[in-house]
Amino acid sequence: MERSALQWVGAPCGSHGPYVFYRAFRFQRRGGGRARVLSLGDFFFVRCRAEEPACIAELQLLWEERTSRQLLSSAKLYFLPEDTPQGRTSDHGEDEVIAVSEKVTVKLEDLAKWAQSDFSKWKCGFRAEPVKPMDVGKNGQKEALMRYRQSTLNSGLNFKDILKEKADLGEDDEDSNLLILSYPQYCRYRSMLKRIQDKPSSILTDQFVLALGGIAVTSKNPQIFYCRDTFDHPTLIENESICDEFAPNLKGRPRKKKPCPQRRDSLNGIKDSNNNSESKAVAKVKCEAKSALPKPKSNNSNCKKGSSEDKSKIAVGEECRADEQAFLVALYKYMKERKTPIERIPYLGFKQINLWTMFQAAQKLGGYETITARRQWKHIYDELGGNPGSTSAATCTRRHYERLILPYERFIKGEEDKPLPPVKPRKQDNSSQEGEAKTKVSGTKRIKNENQKSKKEKDNAQKPQDASEVSSEQEKDQESADQKNFTEHPTAGETKQPNQGPPPLLPEAARPLPMEKIDVTENSSSSEKAKEEVPHLSSFPSLSMPPDEDTVLDATVTKRLHSSADTQEDTKPERRIHKAFTESLENEPPEMPFSTFPVQLPTQSDMEDDKLPEMADYIANCTVKVDQLGNEDIHNALKQTPKVLVVQNFDMFKEKELPGSMSDDSTFGYTPLLYSKGNPGIMSPLAKKKLLSQVSGAALSCSYPYGSPPPLISKKKLNSRDELSSSLSQGPHVPNSDPIAINRPSVIQHVQSFKSKEERKSINDVFKHDMLSKVDPQRCDFSQHCLSSLAESYVPKTDIQDCKDKMTEKRALQHSRVPTFLADFYSSPHLHNLFRHTEHHLNNEQTSKYLPRDMFRESENISTFTQHKHQEKLNLNYHPSLHQQEKKATVEASSDDQPTDLSLPKSIHKQTAKAPGPGLSHSSMAQQEGKGVSLFQAASSQAVSLDCNPKACRVSPMAMTAPKKHSELLHRSGKQQAQRLENLRKMEGMVHPIISRRMSPQNIGAARPLKRGLEELDKVISEKKVRAVSPLHLPKETSVKEKVPDAEGEGSKSLHGLHSGSVLESHKFPLSAPIFPGLYPGTLCTGLNNRLPPGYSHPLQYLKNQTVLSPLMQPLALHSLMVQRQFLTSPANSQQLYRHLATATPVGSSYGDLLHNSIYPLAAINPQAAFPPSQLSSVHPSTKL
């Protein structure tokens, strides 16, 4: 048949490679008869050869091959059973046909010839009753029938125009009257016909009939068959009309890469018009892309040459494979030498990444920087054949490239092996998580990058450069390495500097340090980092940091480094750090007098407090991380950016903490180290288990990281510590910002070991306390880390306070390694604070035994702000770094209008610091406490003693006020001191509670005992139920109460309790007491249990009740007004409440301040004075075990 007689009908319906597909074609009948249109899905009679029997063909595909200009078709042939080799059997139905197993590809002209035989003799098939055209014309049934036909018979293609063409041509009787069904369809059809046999034919067009298997045929003499079997036709292969060689190459699912090569060609102007075969084109594109890759080897030129010259696929493939092999060898070798070996190639889109393809595609698009700038990583992903539906394809591809290939790309380009680009935190809450994830993803690579960066920084630091230069360089390095987490840091550091005043440089130094630390922590496995960091740290102290701060920083950093080094089993870094610290100490100017420090620190703290409002929110969002970060650094960073810097390890946090906490009084809400990085307030079950096991272990023996039992504390040391605490109480105390130490062998362990013996030594040197050094340094280190961190986070400390706190801290640490981890282990930051508070309380209590409680109480009353800060510091004395961190976090959080961690009570110190003017002159807070500054100093000393007192007085969970016994002690300074000594002895007899004491309001808030009303408080005070509370600042309150035994006195006490009392309250739980008798059975609790009333509930009880611990749920998220209302419930307290409000809010009476003053005072309120037990019970259901 002439080509002119054949033509396509309708527009193409698709294309694939060289094929263009159509839905129908028209051919001219023989003899000049009417044209006929055959469309996809049509059944028609054909005769393959003149001598062969007629059969039915089903037209399944029509296409034109552009390269050869062939018009082709694919059809399935159906023969009657008798026309098959097996013949008809009894099993064959009368309407059955058998299909040829293979489709036949036939040129259109041949197919047209096949269809023009005489088929009048064909009599088989079921003669269905056609639907009358008049019936179909009613109610749009024709259109419905057409739609049915299109959707069912034509694979959803639109055949409207084709049908119109057919209608215009008109149909013969023999046209479109064949239909072959599947056997199930046929059965349904016959069944439906039986059901509607008495109905008119129009019912066949009913939608229900059609849905149930009815078939509406409009042709005049429809013949319906069914097919359920196939056979192999013996002679079709011999038919010259059948040309299977033209069959379209469509087997299998089209590869996802196929469209990519085309796009790449268009992008690179390599459009190949001669794509004879898709596979060939793809191969060419691949090779070209690979050749474009700037590879150290010159093989790609061969590959490129081959593709350009149309070499055979085999040759091209071999060359490409050779190039790929050479590339992979070079890549693996380089990455191994770089200490970031490629161990497992990840998957993208359910397909393992082909590093060679990825590298070539990236190079073709211009390399990493260009692709990132142009946001073309999705192109790389498509090149790799990823899942097209992936929404994170670009990010995942880029991160994999950064970790697996980017270092090598930079190497071959001669670029510097810079740290991997930081990951941008998605949200503030998840920033820490994401940062960790990022570091994990690129951990191996980053380790080396960071190590190199650390080395560079080390060199810079070692050079005699200005502090600013060193810090700036370090900042640059670390910013580049951790832009994601620390972009905010530089600003934070800068903001800090003005705020800090005397130690402005420290923040910068600290800032770089934290960055390094983050890297280190991220790659804590490498001891190199610790070594490298040591020089940096040493350089930092050499910066113009105040001597005190330097000392603290040195000690803390040393400890941190030590911890990391210990974990790495590399002591050299520790030695270096110690040396660096000692050198820095030696180089540093003599420590400033304590008198000077208190003034400066309060001012700084005040300034920070002012800043804090912003910080609080961020801290609240990322409680866990905040604690770890340098208090000031975090504080400033948070202020500047809601995004919280993500720090992988606590080591980093501690480093930051050291400089920040040393320089800043502001306290961050402490977050337990054990909390999962992702969820600041949530402790993972594993962590909790570890905590509990560690707690039990700690309680059992002095060797436990939590701290040696009080009996291990020598009375001499305790006495000296008491003296120290008293002397410290005389001036503000700035606990060393020591990292929190934790038994956990992971990051937490590093943190625990952070506190270096050197730091203790520096503290001892500073204070000339040999006693402290005598204590087991390691235990002390651990407890010191915890306590100092806690103290730091809880209360802003003045430099003097820092020194004093350091001494007390050392002693306390030496005496008892109260584990701050317990706080860390708390399920929620609130619990954590409680724990820290109690732990700190224990330590303070031990000292307080020696220090007159009157002094403590007085100091508390004198200046809640100073006292609290200092008290916190005192509490922190044992773990200054920990306390500083926590204190700063709490102070900052409280000073910030928004709490650092809502679950953590805001440190009253912060509140007080905020409210009062800068400096110890926070007399408004002090007045709030109801005592003069001198009292504050005394109080601080007392606080120290209280903190030091190992004996924790039992305070009913709600009693905010100190237990009667303790209050009496507090009331009577002489008695207090005696009782303190007694308590100390008891503490010695008891195992140090694993909970860390916390003086800060956070601790108070952490203390759950808020349930009892003020009257109950009085009763509690009178009763010995409150015994569990260590005589922290409560003594002050107690003394006040003693002075004012009436309800008003109680109210004032409760008010003070909000500040100081609350701190005590948080410390209420005896530090020495086991976490809870119920929680910890056996020897762990034995010593403590003796002293705890049966109903006593330990702060760690929260661990049992995680609903209370939920980080999302503040321990008691009561507005200050609520708290005040509670106070107002008792008339006597109302005055105190208002007085408290007046004093607490003077500096900033913003809602945030109120929240801080009262929510965190809730801790104070916790003092049970404010809240009736019923009210608090719902919030803290597990108050009692």
Curated annotation (Swiss-Prot):
UniProt cross-references to Pfam families, sorted A to Z: ARID (PF01388)
The keyword Hydrolase appears for this protein: no
MF (Gene Ontology): transcription cis-regulatory region binding; transcription coactivator activity
Alphabetic keyword roster: Activator, DNA-binding, Nucleus, Transcription, Transcription regulation
SUPFAM superfamilies named among the record's database cross-references: ARID-like
Compositionally biased tracts (Basic and acidic residues): 447-461, 473-487, 1034-1053
Predominant location: nucleus
Polar residues bias locations: 462-471
Subcellular location: Nucleus
Entries under SMART domains matching the protein: ARID, BRIGHT
Domain ARID: 321-413
Domain of life: Eukaryota
PROSITE patterns from the UniProt entry: ARID
Ranges annotated as biased composition (Basic residues): 252-261
TM region(s), chain numbering: none
The keyword Zinc appears for this protein: no
Region Disordered: start-end pairs: 248-281, 413-550, 713-742, 883-932, 1033-1058
Annotated family: Belongs to the ARID5B family.
Domain commentary: The ARID domain mediates the interaction with DNA.
Function field: Transcription coactivator that binds to the 5'-AATA[CT]-3' core sequence and plays a key role in adipogenesis and liver development. Required for adipogenesis: regulates triglyceride metabolism in adipocytes by regulating expression of adipogenic genes.
Name of the featured protein: AT-rich interactive domain-containing protein 5B
